[in-house]
Amino acid sequence: MDRTVNQVALENDEREAKNTWRLVFRIATLLLIVMTLAFSAAALAYSMEASTPGDLVGIPTAISRAEEKITSALGSNQDVVDRIYKQVALESPLALLNTESIIMNAITSLSYQINGAANNSGCGAPVHDPDYIGGIGKELIVDDASDVTSFYPSAFQEHLNFIPAPTTGSGCTRIPSFDMSATHYCYTHNVILSGCRDHSQSHQYLALGVLRTSATGRVFFSTLRSINLDDTQNRKSCSVSATPLGCDMLCSKVTETEEEDYNSVTPTSMVHGRLGFDGQYHEKDLDVTTLFGDWVANYPGVGGGSFIDSRVWFPIYGGLKPNSPSDTAQEGRYVIYKRYNDTCPDEQDYQIRMAKSSYKPRRFGGKRVQQAILSIKVSTSLGEDPVLTVPPNTVTLMGAEGRVLTVGTSHFLYQRGSSYFSPALLYPMTVNNKTATLHSPYTFNAFTRPGSVPCQASARCPNSCVTGVYTDPYPLVFHANHTLRGVFGTMLDDERARLNPVSAVFDNVSRSRITRVSSSSTKAAYTTSTCFKVVKTNKTYCLSIAEISNTLFGEFRIVPLLVEILKDDKV
């Protein structure tokens, strides 16, 4: 037992010895660490020359200075952020617009040089002011939420009148046609010396110009090139289009009345002309015997054409030769368009019979009056590669005056309401190579035209008529998916007579508040409208070129009516 006790005591002594050495080691280690820290602090103090407590007084000052430097640096960073925002949000878009302006200028100049090489001209190529770049031929109002009729026209604004007026009581200026591209606009009208009903001789005024902004910020149209085609040719029903080579114009050459032309057996002569950037005009007769071999009368649609895919597209209407291939292809075809919430009470069979008869009005000897579209390649050679598209009458109503428009990436054909359907029509149009396809139209029920009974403004049933007046709508309000919501236009707000011109914004059912030209008894006739935006101010304007009665100097005066499009946020 003693051995056991001794063994336990020995183990306890060994354990105490180990604990003692551990304690000694720990104390030595701590002393070594403290000494190391002391030497390090002394070395640091010596290196910083902060050997006295008084030297520590400068630390708060140093901290304050450091704080000021940090604040200044943060301020500089904010300046950088502000400059970046300004660059991204403001300067870069403007720079892009200026770049687009330069590009468009270069393209126009190049086009002019190509044209100038053919006519030995040395004049410069025109282009709109940079304020308008990106605001012409675009979807101007893209809005899915607002009521279309919350947009409305301002009062008419005073601006430079770029349209010549008659200078005698017997003078007549009629049938305006207008088109505007990203670089320039084109305008034309007919000039008759002895009253508006004379068909034997006339002049054709043709002008090329650009949009400018005055020093006070006002919009004005500046005519740069113009010509009055005063020769032995009697050009009628002319349509104009702004193309990269100038102002292309399509006219019929007329020597007889419209009724006589429809009763003839040969197509109407047509001419493709161009006013170049140098102010020189050239034209070429089309081979109508080949192009319009199935027609007895053929006319441009009066409204502007459109430059699409290297070709210029013009609206066409006229009479088909009975039993010709084109006439036979349309036999039995018809379409009936209905008024909004106002159904025709006639029996369906009777409606169909009247709809079919509407394409062959008695006024033109029972000839089928047909809609068509003509495309011509734009090159230094006039009248090159013309191609005629005749759409089926399962889509279009009786042929009538019209206009081809391009807004954004969408193309449209306006068709005058010469037949029974009074509301304005815009057919979506797609192009494939050299031909066009028309689709079911947008209709604007409140945008009507006056007409003779039974095809007056409120008419709702198919009938055979030749009536109405040319008043085209311009696509203004779009959905985000590019479908059309609303248009701007100047209509004649009367049931039967060509009276009371008013401007408004229209959706498919109703219209906005109106801007009236004058009293409800004011006589008027054709109107053609085009809208654009001043990108610099983000203001949208619409131009309505309207034939307004003028009792002192000629029967009509063509007036360019300018409005700004405003918005009523309460609607």
Swiss-Prot record:
Report if keyword NAD is assigned.
no
Tagged with keyword Magnesium: no
Give the keywords, sorted.
Disulfide bond, Glycoprotein, Hemagglutinin, Host cell membrane, Host membrane, Host-virus interaction, Hydrolase, Membrane, Signal-anchor, Transmembrane, Transmembrane helix, Viral attachment to host cell, Viral envelope protein, Virion, Virus entry into host cell
Q: Where is this region: Important for interaction with fusion/F protein?
A: 124-152
Enzyme Commission (EC) number: 3.2.1.18
Intravirion topological domain ranges are: 1-26
List the disulfide bonds in this chain. Answer: 172-196, 186-247, 238-251, 344-461, 455-465, 531-542
Q: Which residues lie on this side of the membrane: Virion surface?
A: 49-571
One Gene Ontology cellular component: virion membrane
Location(s), subcellular: Virion membrane; Host cell membrane
Give the Gene Ontology MF terms in alphabetical order: exo-alpha-sialidase activity; host cell surface receptor binding
Q: What is known of its domains?
A: The C-terminus (head domain) is involved in binding the cellular receptor.
Quaternary structure (record) = Homotetramer; composed of disulfide-linked homodimers. Interacts with F protein trimer. Interacts with host CG-1B; this interaction inhibits viral adsorption and replication rather than internalization.
- Would you tell me the protein name for this molecule? Hemagglutinin-neuraminidase
